[in-house]
From Swiss-Prot:
Transmembrane segment boundaries: 3-23, 28-48, 106-126, 191-211, 237-257
Principal location: membrane
Organism per entry: Mycolicibacterium paratuberculosis (strain ATCC BAA-968 / K-10) (Mycobacterium paratuberculosis)
Cellular component, GO, one term: plasma membrane
Subunit structure: Interacts with the Sec translocase complex via SecD. Specifically interacts with transmembrane segments of nascent integral membrane proteins during membrane integration.
Record carries keyword Repressor: no
Gene Ontology molecular function, alphabetical: membrane insertase activity
Biased composition (Low complexity): 291-301
Subcellular location: Cell membrane
Region (Disordered): 285-353
Protein name: Membrane protein insertase YidC
Bilayer topology: Multi-pass membrane protein
Length: 353
């Protein structure tokens, strides 16, 4: 393995990316063969899955932050209307609002920002399998020298297996419009590269569109009405998917597979996380309803008397004592004058004329 670490480069990105890809490659190569096209393709795809699994919690925070941002839209609009001309006061009020609700907009960007260096690192590692073309940051090697040179954690033998891997003559490290460095591959057929890359490229664009569509569909009406949000929605729905299709011919097949796998994972994870959050919100609503129902009085029940208030003023207790004495007098029959207080439930006596 070529482990010459350069602290003044992006090796801190290149080595982890190549190591994760190398682990998955060795696993699939043991089952499919070291020069198998699908062993290398699956290693790239599972590199994506590993990264996205590590970013699962930040992704959930991103979704919660996005939903919280939508809930705060009415208050943000009110601040914009009130302090629209005073940018400094507007910024202070926005920070105050974010602190009150525990809102951190940086968390919403973390998963996206974390994927950028990984994408650049993977692109560089894949380019480094074929160093016969030279270019920015790449040595210009001969075909023989290239096969005898390792690629970060990949050995020279692994480099040879990568250059040999192809599907119907389409090397996994080649791209449709490639004109140089073709001698490094054992087999190269441009029609085969187009035939393999075009369907994956279209699927990656379609997956990008459906991901964007799912995100836009879950936006609140207030957020969708925002002009900036509306513009970003149009870019996400139409420009980004089209960019994948247009840029596909200039990217290696492995990068197109990376983009396709990333969008497939995002689509599934997005639906799972949104469903989980909706269930949590529904459970909170049901808990609140049950709490209110438990505290509410039963239908037809009389309100409870405040015994403390009665004991404090002594009125009810004093008023109840004569009645109790009169009742006892009636029961004993020893009172001088019969009580005129009717017994509870007794019918009133008719007065004789």
């Amino acid at each position: 393995m070529d482990l010459l670490f350069d602290f003044f480069s992006l090796d801190f990105v290149y080595y982890p990316v190549s190591w994760i890809m190398w682990v998955w490659y060795k696993l699939f190569a043991a089952m499919l063969g070291p020069s198998n096209f699908f062993a290398w393709a699956l290693s790239v795809m599972f590199l994506v899955f590993t990264l996205r699994a590590l970013l699962y919690k930040p992704f959930v925070r991103q979704i919660r932050t996005t939903r919280q941002m939508q809930e705060l839209q009415p208050q943000i609009k009110a601040l914009q209307k009130k302090y629209g001309k005073d940018r400094q006061r507007m910024a202070l009020e926005m920070q105050k609002l974010q602190r009150e609700h525990g809102f951190n907009p940086i968390l919403g960007c973390l998963p996206m920002l974390a994927q950028i260096p990984v994408f650049l690192g993977l692109y560089h590692v894949l380019r480094s399998f074929n160093r016969t073309t030279g270019g920015f940051g790449q040595p210009h090697l001969s075909v023989v020298q290239n096969r005898l040179t390792g690629n970060y954690v990949f050995t020279p033998t692994d480099v040879g297996h990568f250059l040999d891997a192809n599907l119907f003559g389409a090397p996994i490290g080649a791209f449709m419009t490639q004109r140089t460095g073709l001698d490094a591959f054992t087999y190269f057929s441009r029609p085969a590269v187009i035939a393999v890359g075009l369907p994956v490229m279209i699927l990656a664009g379609v997956a990008t569109y459906f991901n964007s569509r799912a995100s836009v569909a879950r936006q609140s009406p207030e957020a969708a009405a925002n002009p900036q949000t509306a513009m970003m929605n149009k870019l996400a729905l139409y420009v980004f998917p089209l960019g994948v299709v247009v840029g596909g011919p200039f990217l290696p097949l492995a990068i197109i597979l990376y983009w396709f796998a990333n969008n497939i994972w995002t689509f599934g994870q997005q639906h799972y996380v949104f469903g989980m959050i909706e269930k949590e919100d529904e459970a909170k609503k049901q808990e609140a309803i049950q709490r209110r129902a438990a505290n509410a009085p039963a239908p037809g029940a009389k309100p409870k008397r405040n015994l403390k208030a009665g004991a404090g003023n002594g009125v009810d207790a004093d008023a109840a004592q004569p009645d109790a004495g009169a009742t006892e007098g009636q029961a004993g029959g020893g009172s001088d004058a019969p009580s005129r207080t009717p017994r509870p439930g007794a019918r009133p006596k008719k007065r004789k004329r």
